[in-house]
Regions:
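Low-complexity, glycine/alanine/serine/threonine- and acidic/polar-rich repeat/linker tracts characteristic
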Residues: 1-16, 20-23, 27-37, 41-51, ...
Length: 175
């Protein structure tokens, strides 16, 4: 009986962790200006490369800032950050192009400096993920879909509502 209680408690903890992750992805995707699906696929690729969600978020936010500032680093890599109509390309598309350039570069100070210039303090940590190139990122995204790891916007919203309801209950109970 005690083993059953322990197993149930473990299952509840795993379920709550999955709900918390979906909620966090939903909120982070809004801050980063990308879909929950795209972010959850990137999170999977990042995790396989040793980068946590916080580091990925820091790096992608820095990428967006550098794109808006028209950083020289993109020119050094021959990566276009604008569409033909002059609007900024999506950060996910630019990330793929940057990853292709990184995949073809030797590891060393130049690569690290470019990573830090584009992705801020998370840049060096993101190099293993970038070294996979856009094809590697796409393969990891497909794998995320195949193993059921990709979170959609509807699931993230449901997780957010669930956690908000729990927070309200805890507040009502004085917790």
């Amino acid at each position: 009986a005690i083993a059953g209680i322990g197993a149930a408690a473990g299952l509840i903890a795993l379920t709550k962790a999955a709900i918390d992750n979906a909620d966090e992805l939903g909120k982070a995707s809004q801050k980063m200006g990308m879909t929950v699906e795209a972010l959850s696929r990137l999170q999977y690729a990042a995790k396989l490369s040793g980068v946590e969600l916080g580091g990925l978020q820091t790096g992608m936010n820095a990428l967006a800032r550098q794109m808006a500032a028209n950083s020289d680093a993109f020119g050094q890599l021959s990566v276009s950050i604008t569409n033909s109509d002059g609007t900024l390309r999506s950060s996910v598309a630019v990330l793929g192009d940057v990853a292709d350039r990184f995949a073809g570069m030797e590891d060393g100070a130049t690569k690290t400096a470019l990573a830090l210039s584009i992705f801020g303090r998370a840049g060096a940590d993101m190099i293993p993920m970038l070294n996979a190139g856009s094809a590697g990122l796409a393969a990891m995204a497909q794998e995320s879909d195949n193993v059921g790891n990709t979170i959609d916007g509807k699931t993230a919203k449901a997780a957010e509502r669930f956690n908000d309801t729990l927070s309200k209950i805890e507040a009502t109970m004085g917790g």
